[in-house]
Amino acid sequence: MTATLERRESANLWARFCDWITSTENRLYIGWFGVLMFPLLLTATSVFIIAFIAAPPVDIDGIREPVAGSLLYGNNIISGAIVPSSAAIGLHFYPIWEAASVDEWLYNGGPYELIVLHFLLGVACYMGREWELSFRLGMRPWIAVAYSAPVAAATAVFLIYPIGQGSFSDGMPLGISGTFNFMIVFQAEHNILMHPFHMLGVAGVFGGSLFSAMHGSLVTSSLIRETTENESVNSGYKFGQEFETYNIVAAHGYFGRLIFQYASFNNSRSLHFFLAAWPVVCIWFTALGISTMAFNLNGFNFNQSVVDSQGRVINTWADIINRANLGMEVMHERNAHNFPLDLA
């Protein structure tokens, strides 16, 4: 009898726990994806902060020339970074217990792998949590689909690119100047500026910013008048009030006259679908571009493609970019090679 009561009580406790995890009444929705997400992102964030402040130099190129990235070793917010794992580690899974000591783990850049892998799993779980909450509220799944674009981009630079290049040392450093260094080296080795998928990504980011600004300014300008003609239209409103204040027909008419009729949406759902789809699809393409360049399927090469009737090269901007690429190529990892293979 006692055993039966204990089993029933424990089953009841588990059911209450499940209800609490999946409840949409909580101030912060947890969900089953959240059970994974919260510890993963807390771990990644904690290790990032500690390593950014105090991690010792890392032998990133595997040639016994450590590179310092933390604040306590002379960096500032701009120059500081979590330095990627050593080329000596390559793609090996390198948790703390695989190293002979914590000092060795730090010297070989173990924190980078720890942060990146926990972060990628964490943001994937965040995407799953978005879907889970949408599902429980009876919503459609497009919020999680939209979030898949930055998840794909992060996965491309932190995981797919190192896999393609054969080492986590080729991943993007976790810092401001480290990000710029990654971009410059990526251009030198893969000519990303001449890749159509990167061009789509630029169109997505800048176009998305433009469309967002245009939409926001149109909505806040197309007020439904609540005052007489002799008063300012602004007098009829309070900033941040809850009920709808704009007229999409007026906004459509304004924008149609500003550019041309069919450049303007008169359907709110079509408009918002476009605002979501444009940057998301373009960033998907960029992530796909990074993932193909990871395996050295690079941007277009138009070097010396224009010649005169005598066969002499007429330089184009492609040749200017090529010369810049060569300069960046010989500058990075300056002591790792006697002569860069790319130039041989």
From Swiss-Prot:
Residue positions binding pheophytin a: 126
PROSITE patterns: REACTION_CENTER
InterPro entries xrefs: D1/D2, Photo_II_D1/D2_sf, Photo_RC_L/M, Photo_RC_L/M_CS, PSII_D1
Cofactor note: The D1/D2 heterodimer binds P680, chlorophylls that are the primary electron donor of PSII, and subsequent electron acceptors. It shares a non-heme iron and each subunit binds pheophytin, quinone, additional chlorophylls, carotenoids and lipids. D1 provides most of the ligands for the Mn4-Ca-O5 cluster of the oxygen-evolving complex (OEC). There is also a Cl(-1) ion associated with D1 and D2, which is required for oxygen evolution. The PSII complex binds additional chlorophylls, carotenoids and specific lipids.
Residues noted as binding chlorophyll a PD1 in the record, renumbered to the chain: 198
Residue numbers bearing the Phosphothreonine modification: 2
Post-translational note: Tyr-161 forms a radical intermediate that is referred to as redox-active TyrZ, YZ or Y-Z.
Modified residues (N-acetylthreonine): 2
Amino-acid positions noted as binding [CaMn4O5] cluster in the UniProt annotation, renumbered to this chain: 170, 189, 332-333, 342, 344
Annotated binding of Fe cation, by residue: 215, 272
Reaction it catalyzes: 2 a plastoquinone + 4 hnu + 2 H2O = 2 a plastoquinol + O2
Membrane topology, from the record: Multi-pass membrane protein
GO biological process: photosynthetic electron transport in photosystem II; response to herbicide
Keywords, in A-Z order: Acetylation, Calcium, Chlorophyll, Chloroplast, Chromophore, Electron transport, Herbicide resistance, Iron, Magnesium, Manganese, Membrane, Metal-binding, Oxidoreductase, Phosphoprotein, Photosynthesis, Photosystem II, Plastid, Thylakoid, Transmembrane, Transmembrane helix, Transport
Binding site residues for a quinone: 215, 264-265
Binding site for chlorophyll a ChlzD1: 118
Entry's family note: Belongs to the reaction center PufL/M/PsbA/D family.
Oligomeric and partner information: PSII is composed of 1 copy each of membrane proteins PsbA, PsbB, PsbC, PsbD, PsbE, PsbF, PsbH, PsbI, PsbJ, PsbK, PsbL, PsbM, PsbT, PsbX, PsbY, PsbZ, Psb30/Ycf12, at least 3 peripheral proteins of the oxygen-evolving complex and a large number of cofactors. It forms dimeric complexes.
PANTHER family named in the record: PHOTOSYSTEM II D2 PROTEIN, PHOTOSYSTEM II PROTEIN D1
Protein name according to UniProt: Photosystem II protein D1
Organism: Staurastrum punctulatum
